[in-house]
UniProtKB/Swiss-Prot annotation:
BP term (GO), one: regulation of DNA-templated transcription
Descriptive protein name: Transcription factor bHLH61
Biased composition (Pro residues): 65-77
Entry keyword annotation includes rRNA-binding: no
Lineage: Eukaryota, Viridiplantae, Streptophyta, Embryophyta, Tracheophyta
Organism: Arabidopsis thaliana (Mouse-ear cress)
Tissue: Expressed constitutively in leaves and flowers.
Amino acid sequence: METELTQLRKQESNNLNGVNGGFMAIDQFVPNDWNFDYLCFNNLLQEDDNIDHPSSSSLMNLISQPPPLLHQPPQPSSPLYDSPPLSSAFDYPFLEDIIHSSYSPPPLILPASQENTNNYSPLMEESKSFISIGETNKKRSNKKLEGQPSKNLMAERRRRKRLNDRLSLLRSIVPKITKMDRTSILGDAIDYMKELLDKINKLQEDEQELGSNSHLSTLITNESMVRNSLKFEVDQREVNTHIDICCPTKPGLVVSTVSTLETLGLEIEQCVISCFSDFSLQASCFEVGEQRYMVTSEATKQALIRNAGYGGRCL
């Protein structure tokens, strides 16, 4: 058994030597200050060989022994394991010059996607539109969930409000309202309309009956009004004559009246004329020449009536 164990240990040492050779190959890529010494592994193996083992031939004692590598004391630090001192930036003078110089960093070159951040592509716009549509749909669903009324319910409320407003207006127009419900308001309005139609028909019948006598009545009233408004008086005394005229006015009536009096041989001594609503003339005249004795007061009156445009109707 001891011979087998020694053979196994030799095989392990050979394997470690092969591994150490691999480490030497790796050291070629590492700086000289950081070389790995493969001899440390050989020293560890040599010390492992020098460990005294019990001479017992039992396999259980061999297995129960702890592995030798785990119980090795820590090796003192050797110059081979010491790492080289770290170099600072101040060991190189050109780095210090760059730090203390007024060196401005190079301009930052942004990619085209970051330079044109304000330019939105159509795909981004479409995605935003889809997002906005989704948000609006969510808002609508949230409103419905919160208990807000639907469009049909709001339309029905507006229709009922208009109907109630019209019923209240109809109720204010109709003078007789029996009850305040809708059926009574509509029934009272219909009855009131029938009553108004009956009154209209009755007035039309009365107008037709009086239509034949309307023309005659208008003539009579006009004649009576003319007779009441016309006034022609002539008061003749020895030498003086007093004239009083009142009639509807018309253009040129003053001039024609004065010329008529001069034709009859009367000269106006004093006269008062008013044309505010009707033509009114009050004059005092005296006779001129011998022809005045030939004209009577009645002839003077008829001449003034004809001059006013009434002929001989208002004698």
